[in-house]
Amino acid sequence: MTSSIYGFITLSVVALISQTTCRSLDLLLDGDFNNGLASFDGSSKWSRLPLEFLAAFDLDPHQAQGQHLAEAPEAPLMEAMKRSRGPSPRRLRSYLRRAAGLRGMKRKMFWQPLGYMPASARAHNNVPEVVNENSQDSGTNVFRYG
């Protein structure tokens, strides 16, 4: 029973990989593999890409949205695309990496100016046994830095 399950899983994984990596059936039947490649002008490693990559790298919605956002000063990606006369995968990857790095920095810097730990790290185990109105530890469970 387990060998048939493993066989089924193996066949389904192989079928999934073959469906995602092969070109469409009509290109294979025609035998014309040059139509299955998209050519860019330039001699880089991105000069010839399979059509599947271009389908996943569809920039038409971004360009349509960028037409009315091009006047805004907060559109550095659209400015870079205008200067380069079209998008290049290398520039888009560098822009997305930079944006992801800034997102991580914002998360790290959020609690630093406040001086308090987040709610998940508060010290709830230091509740005094005798509650006194004059003591400062009576009602707060917030641990303060320094």
From Swiss-Prot:
The keyword Secreted applies. Residues 1-24 form the signal peptide. Coiled coil: none annotated. It comes from Aplysia californica (California sea hare). May have important functions in renal physiology and in animal behavior, as does bradykinin. The keyword Signal applies. Residues 25-80, 92-146 form a propeptide. Neuron L5. It comes from the Eukaryota. Keywords: Cleavage on pair of basic residues, Neuropeptide, Secreted, Signal. One of its GO terms (biological process) is neuropeptide signaling pathway. It is found in: Secreted. Its main location: secreted. GO terms for cellular component: extracellular region. Disulfide bonds: none annotated. This is Bradykinin-like neuropeptide.
